[in-house]
Protein backbone atom coordinates (compact mmCIF):
# COMPACT_ATOMS: atom_id res chain seq x y z
CA UNK A 1 0.00 0.00 0.00
CA UNK A 2 1.14 3.49 -0.78
CA UNK A 3 2.01 5.55 2.24
CA UNK A 4 1.49 8.82 0.30
CA UNK A 5 -1.79 9.96 -1.20
CA UNK A 6 -1.81 9.93 -5.02
CA UNK A 7 -1.80 13.16 -7.05
CA UNK A 8 -5.36 14.46 -7.55
CA UNK A 9 -6.58 15.82 -10.86
CA UNK A 10 -9.27 18.32 -11.78
CA UNK A 11 -11.75 17.33 -14.45
CA UNK A 12 -14.04 20.30 -14.89
CA UNK A 13 -11.51 23.09 -15.00
CA UNK A 14 -11.82 24.02 -18.71
CA UNK A 15 -13.49 26.91 -20.45
CA UNK A 16 -13.64 28.13 -24.02
CA UNK A 17 -12.71 31.63 -25.13
CA UNK A 18 -15.53 34.10 -25.77
CA UNK A 19 -16.72 34.29 -29.38
CA UNK A 20 -16.56 38.11 -29.76
CA UNK A 21 -20.18 38.37 -30.92
CA UNK A 22 -22.26 41.53 -30.94
CA UNK A 23 -22.75 44.84 -32.69
CA UNK A 24 -19.55 46.11 -34.32
CA UNK A 25 -20.96 49.27 -35.96
CA UNK A 26 -23.72 51.21 -34.23
CA UNK A 27 -26.63 53.27 -35.58
CA UNK A 28 -25.53 56.47 -37.33
CA UNK A 29 -21.98 55.20 -37.85
CA UNK A 30 -20.40 55.44 -41.32
CA UNK A 31 -19.46 52.09 -42.89
CA UNK A 32 -17.65 51.07 -46.03
CA UNK A 33 -18.78 48.18 -48.25
CA UNK A 34 -17.67 44.92 -46.64
CA UNK A 35 -17.57 46.26 -43.07
CA UNK A 36 -19.07 43.88 -40.52
CA UNK A 37 -22.02 45.45 -38.69
CA UNK A 38 -23.12 42.56 -36.43
CA UNK A 39 -21.74 39.14 -35.53
CA UNK A 40 -24.49 36.90 -34.17
CA UNK A 41 -25.69 33.33 -33.68
CA UNK A 42 -28.94 33.01 -35.60
CA UNK A 43 -30.77 36.04 -36.96
CA UNK A 44 -31.37 38.06 -33.79
CA UNK A 45 -31.25 41.04 -36.15
CA UNK A 46 -32.44 40.57 -39.73
CA UNK A 47 -30.80 42.08 -42.82
CA UNK A 48 -32.46 45.17 -44.31
CA UNK A 49 -31.50 47.38 -47.26
CA UNK A 50 -27.95 47.30 -48.67
CA UNK A 51 -26.64 44.67 -46.24
CA UNK A 52 -25.64 41.04 -46.75
CA UNK A 53 -26.03 37.98 -44.52
CA UNK A 54 -23.07 35.61 -44.20
CA UNK A 55 -23.39 31.86 -43.66
CA UNK A 56 -22.64 32.37 -39.94
CA UNK A 57 -25.42 35.04 -39.81
CA UNK A 58 -22.92 37.91 -39.84
CA UNK A 59 -24.50 41.09 -41.23
CA UNK A 60 -22.19 43.24 -43.37
CA UNK A 61 -22.49 46.38 -45.50
CA UNK A 62 -22.85 46.07 -49.29
CA UNK A 63 -22.40 49.82 -49.94
CA UNK A 64 -20.72 52.80 -48.29
CA UNK A 65 -23.17 54.66 -46.09
CA UNK A 66 -24.69 55.06 -42.64
CA UNK A 67 -26.03 52.27 -40.42
CA UNK A 68 -29.67 52.43 -39.33
CA UNK A 69 -31.39 50.00 -36.96
CA UNK A 70 -35.12 49.63 -37.65
CA UNK A 71 -38.10 47.63 -36.40
CA UNK A 72 -39.24 45.08 -38.99
CA UNK A 73 -42.41 44.03 -37.15
CA UNK A 74 -43.40 43.44 -33.52
CA UNK A 75 -40.79 40.79 -32.79
CA UNK A 76 -38.07 41.52 -35.33
CA UNK A 77 -35.34 44.10 -35.72
CA UNK A 78 -33.48 44.82 -38.93
CA UNK A 79 -30.40 46.77 -39.85
CA UNK A 80 -29.91 48.69 -43.08
CA UNK A 81 -27.23 50.86 -44.67
CA UNK A 82 -28.33 54.03 -46.43
CA UNK A 83 -26.08 55.90 -48.87
CA UNK A 84 -24.71 59.37 -48.22
CA UNK A 85 -27.16 61.96 -49.54
CA UNK A 86 -25.56 64.41 -51.96
CA UNK A 87 -27.05 67.90 -51.54
UniProtKB/Swiss-Prot annotation:
Any one GO BP annotation for this protein: translation
Any Pfam family hit: Ribosomal_L27
SUPFAM superfamilies listed in its UniProt record: Ribosomal L27 protein-like (SSF110324)
A GO MF label: structural constituent of ribosome
Entry keyword set: Ribonucleoprotein, Ribosomal protein
InterPro entries per UniProt: Ribosomal_bL27, Ribosomal_bL27_CS
Record carries keyword Magnesium: no
Family label: Belongs to the bacterial ribosomal protein bL27 family.
Matches recorded under HAMAP family: Ribosomal_bL27
Protein name in the entry: Large ribosomal subunit protein bL27
Organism: Nautilia profundicola (strain ATCC BAA-1463 / DSM 18972 / AmH)
Gene (UniProt): rpmA
